[in-house]
């Protein structure tokens, strides 16, 4: 008879209940030699002498965003290596591929007719630069035409124009604002209109015979001087900033308020004109790196505990909560471990991954390049979903994860764990962040999942993902939690089990893209 595994969900706020306490402490006797002083010292240092604010300032303000292939990404790699070495921790940059090098310059966009207004906007990543040229031209809206034949006939009209290719949002107020103040019938009416408008705009794009990726190229080939978009992030003042698809002319995102202004003026026949000047540099193929730091194990140096956080970011903001906070969490955790646990039983590594944003490429490459580490991984702890306290930890489909994670959590002070919800054995993550690269290879990688702090709308990939959004008390707590979990995993006399739960579909291990943005 095959053994089956029941999925166990519980909340660590229930730790006073005997049956849950027993679950977490069932194997704690194996830690008779665990040094409580190490945990006490980590808590004291992490609370009273934390370096997270200093690290955040140096990374987010001093270096800024870390787009893969940009000079700032390499600057951040080198900064992290130097910082680790200043703490007495061995560190290195490991090359795993190459990417299209690009350096962002300035973006100046102004409406000059029918009246003058400086507009809030920025070029998208990898947008072609304009050199020293400034373009002044009329703004037009992508028309709603019958079909692709009609669109081809219209295309010459785009010559010499800026073309708006995004839907104008019916409201700049996020839904939570409507829920708080609007009449219910007004809110429902707005949502229905927005749904219909979104479907109609999607159909408008489809009827051109192109899609969101190919339409900008068709327009630039027809002579458009620039492409204007708005990728609203459903909050006040936020846009998501991703990649340009044009090869010759700039693509910019203009904030909802200004995009709506231009759209309404164009729609009503006022023929608005804007002046645009954007600069950027193409740098050719540049090497891409993961930054790896290491505290060598003494008893089992060929077994590994890993901390994990992607280092790259989109560049509309400064990559503060995606994933500057994960980065400084793991750097601070390593600092704490080096200071109070300098001779771990197992080797403790940290991986700061490149090109997570384009598909977990840095961590996938590491998994491919280091099978000996993947095979002998005791546990990996990853943090990548914002600045909030860790509130969720799942077993990622490993049948016995509740046993060893339970043992390690038992030593974590209640102030750090009393709001964490556990899900055992859970389901294996197929993507989303770098722990999934290890899980797909059958290695025990776990996500330290955080409170939202409106992450999805206000900071995730947005122009407002900046230092001021970091909640440092929560980051400090996460750094101490990560350090203690790494300590306990290193000390555990037992090797963690990688037996997969029955009936769980395991994700496919995907290969890293090692040459990006250069072949299209």
Give the residues covered by each predicted segment.
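Soluble metallo-hydrolase cores and metallopeptidase-like ectodomains found primarily
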Residues: 36-38, 127-152, 236, 241-320, ...
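Noncatalytic luminal/extracellular "stalk/propeptide" segments of secretory-pathway proteins
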Residues: 35-37, 57, 61-195
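Bacterial N-terminal signal peptides
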Residues: 17-28
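Active-site-adjacent substrate-binding region
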Residues: 197-208, 213-216, 220-221, 226, ...
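Bacterial N-terminal signal peptides that target proteins for export
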Residues: 2-19
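Metal-dependent peptidase/peptidase-like ectodomains
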Residues: 116-118, 132, 137, 146, ...
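Second-shell loop/turn segments in exported
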Residues: 39-46, 61-71, 137-145, 151-153, ...
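N-terminal capping segment at the start of a domain
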Residues: 36-70, 96, 106, 234-244, ...
């Amino acid at each position: 008879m095959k053994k089956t595994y029941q999925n166990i969900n519980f909340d660590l706020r229930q730790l006073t209940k005997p049956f849950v306490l027993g679950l977490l402490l069932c194997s704690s006797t194996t830690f008779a030699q665990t040094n409580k002083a190490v945990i006490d010292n980590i808590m004291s240092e992490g609370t009273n002498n934390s370096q997270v604010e200093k690290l955040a300032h140096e990374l987010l303000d001093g270096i800024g965003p870390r787009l893969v292939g940009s000079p700032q990404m390499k600057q951040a790699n080198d900064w992290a290596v130097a910082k680790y070495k200043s703490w007495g921790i061995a560190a290195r940059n490991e090359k795993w591929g190459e990417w299209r090098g690009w350096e962002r310059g300035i973006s100046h966009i102004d409406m000059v007719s029918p009246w003058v207004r400086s507009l809030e906007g920025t070029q998208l990543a990898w947008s072609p630069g304009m050199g020293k040229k400034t373009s002044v031209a009329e703004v037009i809206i992508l028309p709603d035409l019958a079909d692709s034949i009609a669109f081809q006939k219209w295309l010459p009209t785009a010559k010499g124009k800026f073309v708006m290719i995004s839907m104008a949002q019916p409201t700049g107020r996020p839904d939570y604002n409507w829920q708080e103040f609007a009449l219910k019938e007004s809110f429902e009416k707005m949502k229905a209109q927005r749904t219909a408008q979104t479907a109609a705009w999607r159909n408008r794009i489809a009827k051109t015979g192109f899609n969101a990726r190919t339409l900008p190229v068709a327009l630039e080939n027809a002579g458009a001087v620039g492409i204007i978009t708005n990728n609203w992030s459903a909050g006040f003042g936020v846009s998501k900033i991703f990649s340009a698809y044009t090869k010759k002319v700039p693509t910019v995102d203009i904030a909802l308020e200004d995009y709506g202004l231009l759209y309404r003026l164009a729609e009503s026949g006022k023929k608005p004109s804007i002046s645009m000047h954007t600069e950027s540099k193409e740098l050719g193929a540049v090497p891409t790196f993961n930054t790896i730091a290491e505290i060598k194990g003494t008893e089992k140096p060929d077994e590994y505990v890993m901390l994990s956080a992607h280092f790259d970011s989109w560049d509309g903001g400064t990559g503060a909560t995606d994933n500057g906070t994960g980065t400084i969490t793991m750097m601070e955790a390593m600092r704490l471990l080096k200071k109070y646990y300098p001779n771990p039983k197992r080797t403790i590594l940290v991986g700061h991954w490149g090109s997570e944003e384009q598909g977990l490429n840095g961590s996938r490459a590491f998994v491919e390049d280091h099978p000996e580490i993947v095979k002998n991984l005791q546990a990996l702890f990853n943090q990548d979903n914002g600045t909030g306290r860790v509130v969720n930890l799942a077993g990622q489909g490993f049948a016995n994860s509740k046993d060893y994670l339970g043992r390690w959590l038992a030593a974590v002070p209640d102030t750090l764990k009393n709001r964490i919800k556990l899900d055992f054995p859970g389901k294996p993550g197929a993507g989303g962040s770098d722990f999934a690269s290890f899980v797909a290879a059958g290695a025990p990688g776990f996500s330290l999942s955080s409170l939202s702090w409106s992450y999805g709308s206000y900071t995730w990939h947005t122009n407002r993902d900046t230092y001021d959004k970091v909640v440092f008390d929560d980051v400090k707590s996460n750094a101490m939690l990560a350090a203690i979990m790494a300590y306990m995993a290193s000390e555990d006399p037992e090797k963690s089990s990688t037996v997969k739960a029955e009936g769980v579909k395991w994700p496919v291990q995907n290969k890293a893209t090692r040459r990006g943005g250069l072949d299209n």
